[in-house]
UniProtKB/Swiss-Prot annotation:
Coiled coil: none
Signal peptide (from-to): none
One GO MF term attached to the UniProt entry: tRNA binding
Region of interest called Disordered, as start-end residue ranges on this chain: 108-135
A single BP term in Gene Ontology: translation
Function recorded in the entry: With S4 and S5 plays an important role in translational accuracy. Interacts with and stabilizes bases of the 16S rRNA that are involved in tRNA selection in the A site and with the mRNA backbone. Located at the interface of the 30S and 50S subunits, it traverses the body of the 30S subunit contacting proteins on the other side and probably holding the rRNA structure together. The combined cluster of proteins S8, S12 and S17 appears to hold together the shoulder and platform of the 30S subunit.
Subunit structure, interactors included: Part of the 30S ribosomal subunit. Contacts proteins S8 and S17. May interact with IF1 in the 30S initiation complex.
Superkingdom of source: Bacteria
Cited Gene3D superfamilies: Nucleic acid-binding proteins
Gene: rpsL
Protein name: Small ribosomal subunit protein uS12
PANTHER family for the chain: 30S RIBOSOMAL PROTEIN S12 FAMILY MEMBER
Amino acid sequence: MPTINQLIRKERKKVVKKTKSPALVECPQRRGVCTRVYTTTPKKPNSALRKVAKVRLTSKFEVISYIPGEGHNLQEHSIVLVRGGRVKDLPGVKYHIVRGALDTAGVNKRTVSRSKYGTKKAKATDKKATDSKKK
């Protein structure tokens, strides 16, 4: 522990917090343009074709971001909204594309966790029709 004289001569260093998503530059999300949309394979124990996109952000960063959900409508020059959040089994993928925002469509026929995939609530007419038949 330093003495008072040592603290007078040289004050304590401030702890610098390192962000896990530097390309967002202190913003919750950033807009960007897809420069390449492709699939890639995950790390060792897992096996799949994960959909990812290389995105040029408004902050001038070029990042690789994951496209969540089943199926997507993204192609080159699509405008997307990017949020933080890495994908554990894809090295170098530290961002997610927000579904249902800007050019990205929501996931079709999604019933559970719809808010995460930009899906509107299904029409309740089907449910009422089945309930009336039961009575």
